[in-house]
Amino acid sequence: MRADPASAAADIFEANRARGAVRFDVRLQDGMTRRHHLHESGSLRVRFPSPEDDGLSAMFVNTAGGIAGGDRFAVEVAAGEGSRVTLSSAAAEKVYRAPGKPAELDIALTAAAGAHIAWLPQETILFDRARIHRRIDIDLAATASLLLCEIVVFGRTAMGERMREGEFVDRWRLRRGGRLVFAETVRLDGDIGGKLAHPAIANGAAAIGTALIVPGDAALVERIRESLPAFRGEAGLSAWNGFAMARFCAQDAASLRADMMAVLGCASAVPLPRLWLN
């Protein structure tokens, strides 16, 4: 019996896709946040730099060198009562052209009473015709806190490249005290370059970003608003239901990163990961 060529090609494609997962939890012990259980698999790894305070820092490393179509990665982090953890990445994540299936990235963050999670990865860079589906699920206790930021760059702007076509689906869900308090799905596909050029979407920007701050209120928004005149790009701020959100767009990654850092400085006493400062 001869193998079906299409089926054989699909099997080869699947066998060559990258897989990676990191799962761990942290607990407060003797006044310090310490790593507890840890699981790593595939090409995703995590490193724990020397702590600068009583919190814990974790840095994710993708040894595959980037994300391609059909790759699947997962991150799960749970913070125990009173613990504090800052999560970042060793480098900007590159998502390459995907002729077939989209890449998939699942992120699950859980914080118990009094815990704090800061999710501060470096930017995600989408190459032309990249395809990725990302899902971020957050479950906070009523007294837990969160600082979450994401930057997406459409093309290698430092090299003068722009993303013309592709697919980007970004699904966020936030639960607080067992209730769903925020749900959003962003979907850009097809002629992404043309859509980003639309004044009602990104007005020609090549980089977008979002910062979600829990708890957050109007006073925090006013503190951030005072720094707006120095921004290199554009930003919008709002606060409702006990949390605050800032949205950004800029012509390049460096400008958006600078604006994001200004907001993070207003929003949290947690120091930025050292790699953000390089």
Curated annotation (Swiss-Prot):
The keyword Repeat does not apply. It comes from the Bacteria. The lineage of its organism: Bacteria, Pseudomonadati, Pseudomonadota, Alphaproteobacteria, Hyphomicrobiales. Its main location: cytoplasm. The gene is ureD3. UreD, UreF and UreG form a complex that acts as a GTP-hydrolysis-dependent molecular chaperone, activating the urease apoprotein by helping to assemble the nickel containing metallocenter of UreC. The UreE protein probably delivers the nickel. Belongs to the UreD family. GO terms for molecular function: nickel cation binding. Pfam families: UreD. This is Urease accessory protein UreD 3. It is found in: Cytoplasm. Keywords: Chaperone, Cytoplasm, Nickel insertion.
